[in-house]
């Protein structure tokens, strides 16, 4: 067994191998930093991509196999930790049966319960179910136990993310109302359910693929438009409080193909530990006809010292030296 070549640079759109030399398979993913280690969770897409014969739009799919987990100290070299949440193959009625849809898994750590809580978009093959699913584990690498799927506060939930604020309160952001409006759902103290308080934001603006982060005293949401697997313009929005009013700032991407988000779609924003004002914007470059070979586009966010304006410039190759040390 030969140790694979170490990754020295981020190379967006290129095949990105794990420490064993296999392509990283963690799509629509999210990153958790816990006790000195980053954990990357994503859709584990294995096997042939098919277009169902009854499809009325390009809903290319692979069977659900589960949610993969990778670990890293440096964000560049990732060790495959296995499938942290496995599809339930012996119960055809399960939300996470191979015939169903499981997308955009995000894991947060609950300091009170000491549990790792995974939220995900679960759906029927025709995307009519529009629910959120929740699973929990005692360890970051799993195994995660699937708890339940539901419509948060009785409303549709498709593309989604979870954000934990500095005070320990968690929120689920989800594309609701036929993907036309973003719902921000506050969660219970154990992070496993909505607590009943929610707001409707970006009404009628059809934003998907939310990624939320905090910089200074402000909250930011990066999102995409709503064009299926095909790329569109990214958009950044800002708020003084999560449940407050959000202001659209426009497209932060710059460089070639910026108006198409470099052919990517947002999935997460990583705060880089030990660096000042350092965030990585993570995008998926979907290959709709071969979803397993969808690539990743990770790019550094640039924050202007004077104006606090955030841009995401294209880099074909970069490393963490672009950020200043704390």
Task: Describe each region flagged by the PLM.
Residues 2-326:
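Carbohydrate-active catalytic/glycan-binding domains of CAZyme proteins
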């Amino acid at each position: 067994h030969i140790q694979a070549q170490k990754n020295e640079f981020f190379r967006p759109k290129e095949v990105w191998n794990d420490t064993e030399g296999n392509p990283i398979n963690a799509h629509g993913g999210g990153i958790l930093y816990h006790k000195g280690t980053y954990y990357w969770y994503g859709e584990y897409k294995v096997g042939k991509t098919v277009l169902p014969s009854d499809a009325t739009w390009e809903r290319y799919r692979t069977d659900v196999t589960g949610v993969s987990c990778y670990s890293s100290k440096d964000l560049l070299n990732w060790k495959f930790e296995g499938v942290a949440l496995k599809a339930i193959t012996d119960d055809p009625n399960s939300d996470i049966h191979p015939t169903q849809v499981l997308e955009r898994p995000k894991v947060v750590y609950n300091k009170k319960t000491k549990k790792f809580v995974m939220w995900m978009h679960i759906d029927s093959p025709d995307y009519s179910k529009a629910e959120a699913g929740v699973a929990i584990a005692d360890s970051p690498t799993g195994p995660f136990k699937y708890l339940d799927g539901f419509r948060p506060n009785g409303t549709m939930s498709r593309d989604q993310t979870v954000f934990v604020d500095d005070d320990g309160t968690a929120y689920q952001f989800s594309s609701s109302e036929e993907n036309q409006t973003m719902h921000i759902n506050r969660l219970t103290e154990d992070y496993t359910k909505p607590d009943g308080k929610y707001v409707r934001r970006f009404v009628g603006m059809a934003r998907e693929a939310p990624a939320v982060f905090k910089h200074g005293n402000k909250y930011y949401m990066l999102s995409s438009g709503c064009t299926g697997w095909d790329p569109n313009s990214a958009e950044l929005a800002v708020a003084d409080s999560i449940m407050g009013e959000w202001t659209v700032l426009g497209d932060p991407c710059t460089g070639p193909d910026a108006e198409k988000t470099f052919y990517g779609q947002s999935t997460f924003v990583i705060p880089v530990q030990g660096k000042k004002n350092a965030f990585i914007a993570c995008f998926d470059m979907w290959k709709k006809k071969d979803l397993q070979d969808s690539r990743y586009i990770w790019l550094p966010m640039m924050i202007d010292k004077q104006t606090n304006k955030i841009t995401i410039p294209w880099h074909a190759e970069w490393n963490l030296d672009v950020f200043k040390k704390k």
